[in-house]
């Protein structure tokens, strides 16, 4: 299902829009020009119907496609519905903002980087700073922080309502009992914890994502602590659909975990996030620990800067324990070394 260029809202200014419109709607058909403009505000709460923002339009398009699938019951279908919220900017119809009181939101207790963490490890939240109503440097005010958290909740509730419409259409079209549904996010989000906003880090709040699966024959209402990677979703879908997964797929099916939440698929997972100057942060997460190894690709292992966190004793990641637990570090680095080394997203061009 197309995204309908919903991120173009970032480049419109509120004062340029008629009161019955939204920044997002105003720019759906002007996306080429939108990229030439400075970013607008980080939030918006126009008193408009759901389909005046992108996710409402996406939901309507998904429903049309489900209705078309009903007309061909003998044909299987695959539908990828990519909702944008709660990505920045935090925009949603006013009724979703009205679900919450901004003053009721508590600010994070921990608003500083982990003790002993390298200076470059926390995100500088440049994505948020690009918006005209956000500071170019320094922290946001407590009022701004509450407003952003309010916006995140409103945007999440808005997306949830659109998802509900799609699921209702699946049911009303008689497709629900024979359809596999997977809901997941592509990253987490810092909401002021550790003094950070946005994603772009290797910390738990940014790296951990929700994954929800509903499928025929799978009992609902269960939770699991099993570790998975997003690469595991493809082979899981293939197994649930009784289809062979391509041999070259890196992921592992977790279909058996859906039947038995106490089962496991992986003993650890890997994720990566870079920093300037060519540094790559390769992270390994087990049920108890996360180790982050910061170094340039192909650099000697002894050049690495390390972070280690113990979620059993320190779930909030308040202190880097790498110097205090060398045995754990050595064990996790040995596991990490069994995986291919990550490369920069954009290779440095050789100077001529």
Where is each model-derived feature located?
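Catalytic-site neighborhoods of secreted/periplasmic enzymes
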Residues: 1-49, 199, 281
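Beta-strand elements within well-structured catalytic alpha/beta cores of enzymes
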Residues: 76-83, 152, 156-159, 163, ...
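C-terminal cap/loop subdomain of S1 sulfatases and analogous C-terminal strand-loop tails that border
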Residues: 4, 8-12, 18-19, 70, ...
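Active-site rim elements
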Residues: 45-53, 141-154, 198, 218-228, ...
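Short catalytic/ligand-binding loop motif for oxyanion handling, primarily in non-cytosolic enzymes
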Residues: 1-3, 75, 85-92, 99, ...
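Active-site regions of oxyanion-processing enzymes, predominantly non-cytosolic
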Residues: 2-24, 54-114, 159, 171-180, ...
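Histidine-centered active-site microenvironments of extracellular/periplasmic hydrolases
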Residues: 89-94, 169-222, 229
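Long, internal low-complexity/basic segments
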Residues: 126-147, 155, 159, 277-280, ...
